[in-house]
Amino acid sequence: MDLSFTKMHGTGNDYIYINCFKEKFTVEDAIKYSPILSHRHYSIGADGIILIMPSDKADVQMRMFNYDGSESEMCGNGIRCVAKYAYDRGISKNNPMKIETLRGILEAELFLKDEEVDTVEISMSSPILEGLKIPTTIDKTPIINEPIIFNDKTYYFTAVSMGNPHAVIFVNDLHNMDISSIGSYMENNSIFPNRTNVEFVEIINRGEVKQRTWERGSGETLACGTGASAVCVAGFISGRTDNIILNHLLGGDLILRYENDNVFMKGEARYCFEGTITL
């Protein structure tokens, strides 16, 4: 079977996008082929696969699969690319655009340049702060500065769900963090029944932070939109940051705004290349 695809990225968070309006590629196919096609040495290379599909509830639907084939509820960087692809390719010319996800229907405001989408602001919806609903095994709301011990050192995390679980850890020196070891330990800790994403954050000032990301099922990535949204919420509810922040991720910058119990994320969406691969 020959499969046409488009490689795109949002702040370096790169996925293989499949237009299921044209391609006969199913959810089961995505689960099977994501570990194969996402391999950076033997295939296309990406953080995973995102399907762009018809929706009877919104303008378009997205389904997102991690590097290991597991499915996630939402991807903040991915949804910006879905909006760009759908608008640029004429699937939907609505602005704002409604996109169906496993988290629900989210709205994307499109900012154009030369008649194509340049940047996208996503209404990421309300964060979930109830411990058992994130989910964690901790019956507390909210979970702020919760201690956890790794290699005889205590770290403190704030738990937030943006449709997928996040553990946000504020640190003094982001550069020298052992992201792989700590991230893997946190991801698979029994505190998180569905595993978790982990964000390591260094505060520059109340309106500016730096972030590194350990994504559930993918490992360290250059960016995570839901993670950046969780960082915005965690920083604000813990009193560390204001409700509007500039977040510097390894793959680029995002602007986050937390107001009226909703998180808004604005950033770029970019094409990498297109191709056809034989499965």
UniProtKB/Swiss-Prot annotation:
GO cellular component, as recorded: cytosol
Location within or outside the cell: Cytoplasm
Active site per database record: 75 (proton donor), 224 (proton acceptor)
Reactions it catalyzes: (2S,6S)-2,6-diaminopimelate = meso-2,6-diaminopimelate
EC annotation from Swiss-Prot or TrEMBL: 5.1.1.7
Annotated positions binding substrate: 13, 66, 76-77, 164, 197, 215-216, 225-226
Pathway terms, separated by semicolons: Amino-acid biosynthesis; L-lysine biosynthesis via DAP pathway; DL-2,6-diaminopimelate from LL-2,6-diaminopimelate: step 1/1
Alphabetical list of Gene3D superfamilies matching this protein: Diaminopimelate Epimerase, Chain A, domain 1 (3.10.310.10)
Keyword tags: Amino-acid biosynthesis, Cytoplasm, Isomerase, Lysine biosynthesis
Broad enzyme group: isomerase
Signal peptide start and end residues: none
GO terms for MF: diaminopimelate epimerase activity
Keyword Nucleotidyltransferase: no
Site (Could be important to modulate the pK values of the two catalytic cysteine residues): 166, 215
Primary localization: cytoplasm
Pfam families, per database record: DAP_epimerase (PF01678)
GO BP of this protein: lysine biosynthetic process via diaminopimelate
UniProt cross-references to HAMAP family, sorted A to Z: DAP_epimerase
Assigned protein family: Belongs to the diaminopimelate epimerase family.
Quaternary structure (record): Homodimer.
Function: Catalyzes the stereoinversion of LL-2,6-diaminopimelate (L,L-DAP) to meso-diaminopimelate (meso-DAP), a precursor of L-lysine and an essential component of the bacterial peptidoglycan.
Protein name in the entry: Diaminopimelate epimerase
Organism of provenance: Brachyspira hyodysenteriae (strain ATCC 49526 / WA1)
Gene label: dapF
